[in-house]
Swiss-Prot record:
Keywords: Glycosyltransferase, Magnesium, Pyrimidine biosynthesis, Transferase
Entries under InterPro entries matching the protein: OPRT, Orotate_PRibTrfase_bac, PRibTrfase_dom, PRTase-like
Gene name of this polypeptide: pyrE
Keyword Transmembrane: no
Species per Swiss-Prot/TrEMBL record: Helicobacter pylori (strain Shi470)
Residues bound to 5-phospho-alpha-D-ribose 1-diphosphate: 113-121
Subunit structure: Homodimer.
UniProt protein name: Orotate phosphoribosyltransferase
Length: 201
């Protein structure tokens, strides 16, 4: 399955000057919501991701995603794996588990995002779950921005990667674009970064 073509065909690979949720600036932005608005395509992508996870013989009892971006991807992945789905959300800028969701002690959970850049949001989600007694066994995403190391990729973890090296990251594709710290972003000399939809939006 050509993941890059899926994003291009859905007009989900945007070009411009963007402020990513990780804090980095980039000339490209992946808008997974445009890909996932097609239920059949969302199901196909989730099944492809689930196949990787199943081949790794991991025991996963639940999928959890940080809201809002990860919810559709996480729900479809949980459906493909045949496990329950929950999500965390921000309350006063702090990640929390609400809406009656609970986790069992030592429940094995995979944290799923639509896109993994540094993995910061995924780790905030994981921390909430671990504090409630759950066991994080893996991370998943439709796409990886190339900072974190994923299973089946030759790319190594880069500076800024937040995901722990001892847990696997499963993703369908690496999208490696130039990313800049705001203090040294060359794009800022000619334009202002826009935030197309993530934290605080």
């Amino acid at each position: 399955m050509d993941i890059k073509a899926c994003y291009q065909n859905a007009k989900a690979l945007l070009e411009g000057h963007f402020l990513l949720s990780s804090g980095f600036h980039s000339n490209y932005y992946l808008q997974s919501a445009k890909v996932l608005e097609d239920p059949k395509l969302a199901e196909q992508l989730a099944k492809e991701l689930a196949k990787q996870i199943q081949e790794a013989h991991l025991n996963i009892e639940c999928v959890c995603s940080p809201a809002i971006g990860g919810i559709l991807a996480g729900y479809e992945l949980a459906r493909a794996l045949g496990v329950r789905f929950i999500f965390t959300e921000r309350v006063d800028n702090t990640m929390a588990l609400r809406r009656g969701f609970e986790v069992k002690k030592n429940e094995k959970i995979l944290v799923c995002e639509d896109i993994i850049t540094t993995g910061k949001s995924a780790m905030e989600c994981a921390k909430v779950l671990e504090e409630k007694g759950a066991q994080i066994v893996a991370f998943g995403a439709l796409a990886n921005r190339g900072i974190c190391k994923r299973v089946h990729s030759h790319l190594k973890a880069q500076e800024g990667a937040c995901l722990p090296s001892h847990l696997p990251l499963f993703a369908l594709e690496d999208f490696v674009f130039d990313m800049h710290k705001p203090s040294s972003c060359p794009l800022c000399t000619t334009s202002t970064a826009i935030k197309p939809g993530s934290r605080g939006n």
